[in-house]
Swiss-Prot record:
Subunit structure: Homotetramer. Interacts with protein M2-1; the interaction between the two tetramers is required for the anti-termination and elongation transcriptional activities of protein M2-1. Interacts with host phosphatase PP1; this interaction recruits PP1 to the inclusion bodies. Formation of a complex PP1/M2-1/P allows P to target host PP1 phosphatase to the M2-1 substrate. Interacts (via C-terminus) with the nucleoprotein N (via N-terminus); the phosphorylated phosphoprotein P binds to N-RNA complex. Interacts (via N-terminus) with the monomeric RNA-free nucleoprotein N.
Predominant place of localization: virion
Phylogenetic placement of the source organism: Viruses, Riboviria, Orthornavirae, Negarnaviricota, Haploviricotina
Disordered: region residues: 199-241
Protein name: Phosphoprotein
Region (Binding to RNA-directed RNA polymerase L): 216-232
Organism, scientific name: Bovine respiratory syncytial virus (strain A51908) (BRS)
Functional summary from the UniProt entry: Plays critical roles in regulating RNA replication and transcription through its interactions with multiple proteins. Tethers the RNA-directed RNA polymerase L to the nucleoprotein-RNA complex. Recruits the M2-1 protein, a processivity factor that is required for efficient transcription of viral RNA. Acts as a chaperone for neo-synthesized nucleoprotein by forming an N-P complex that preserves N in a monomeric and RNA-free state and prevents the association of nascent N with host cell RNAs. Recruits the host phosphatase PP1 to inclusion bodies to regulate viral transcription.
Region (Binding to protein M2-1): 90-110
GO (cellular component) term, any one: virion component
Keywords from the UniProt entry: Host cytoplasm, Host-virus interaction, Inhibition of host NF-kappa-B by virus, Phosphoprotein, Viral RNA replication, Virion
Post-translational modification: Constitutively phosphorylated by host. Phosphorylation at S-116, S-117, S-119, S-232 and S-237 is required for transcription inhibition by M2-2 and viral particle egress. Phosphorylation at S-232 and S-237 increases the affinity of the binding to the nucleoprotein.
GO molecular function (one): RNA-directed RNA polymerase activity
Length: 241
């Protein structure tokens, strides 16, 4: 037969229940828990008592949404656009001694025929008259340079060794410039002689030709045009030969 727990009824059941609860109270209650409790937190219908020694502190943290953060950053940032090109302010003419020289140089090389004594057509024109004119201009510039150096030498002449050194340096510079201009003139003369020699050689070849039709070769025509035609502005190149 199966055994069943005894059943209690009436006053007897009440007495047994009271004794059972008192026995449980003695087992789960200590002397330390007899102190006054500060607060009770209710979580899912379970009562938890907190002692006085363990206070609970709460802090509030505000978490911004990403859109709010972006708006705040955009509002706080100030975008300053840098210029693509920066220009230096020019010094006043009183403080910059090279302003006048700079302006004169620009005016000389800005294709202004009144200021510049050389043009592209004149440089490429290798006729006799043009080369002679260029040599005349070289001589004129050389005279100006010599006069300027002579003036500086006289101005710097003196008893001190420093002034003597300046004078010697200027004289050496003058001689160097004279030599450069002289070499340029010699190169021009050599070129004219070479062109004349080539023309003569082409002419001799044509005189030896026994064919009925006599005409100049392309090279001879080129040389003849350069040496005799004053209006020609053609130049020779290595491909012509």
């Amino acid at each position: 037969m199966e055994k069943f727990a005894p059943e209690f009824h009436g006053e007897d059941a009440n007495t047994k229940a009271t004794k059972f609860l008192e026995s449980l109270k003695g087992k789960f209650t200590s002397s330390k828990d007899s102190r006054k409790k500060d607060s009770i937190i209710s979580v899912n219908s379970i009562d938890i008592e907190l002692p006085k020694e363990s206070p609970i502190t709460s802090t509030n943290h505000n978490i911004n949404q990403p859109s709010e953060i972006n708006d705040t950053i955009a509002a706080n940032q100030v975008h300053i656009r840098k210029p693509l090109v920066s220009f230096k302010e020019e010094l006043p003419s009183s403080e910059n001694p090279f302003t006048k020289l700079y302006k004169e140089t620009i005016e000389t090389f800005d294709n202004n025929e009144e200021e510049s004594s050389y043009s592209y057509d004149e440089i490429n024109d290798q006729t006799n008259d043009n080369i002679t004119a260029r040599l005349d201009r070289i001589d004129e510039k050389l005279s100006e340079i010599i006069g300027m150096l002579h003036t500086l030498v006289v101005a710097s002449a003196g008893p001190t060794a420093a002034r003597d050194g300046i004078r010697d340096a200027m004289v050496g510079l003058r001689e160097e410039m004279i030599e450069k201009i002289r070499s340029e003139a010699l190169m021009t003369n050599d070129r004219l002689e070479a062109m004349a020699r080539l023309r003569d050689e082409e002419s001799e070849k044509m005189t030896k030709d026994t064919s009925d039709e006599v005409k100049l070769t392309p090279t001879s025509e080129k040389l003849n045009m350069v040496l005799e035609d004053e209006s020609s502005d053609n130049d020779l190149s290595l491909e012509d030969f």
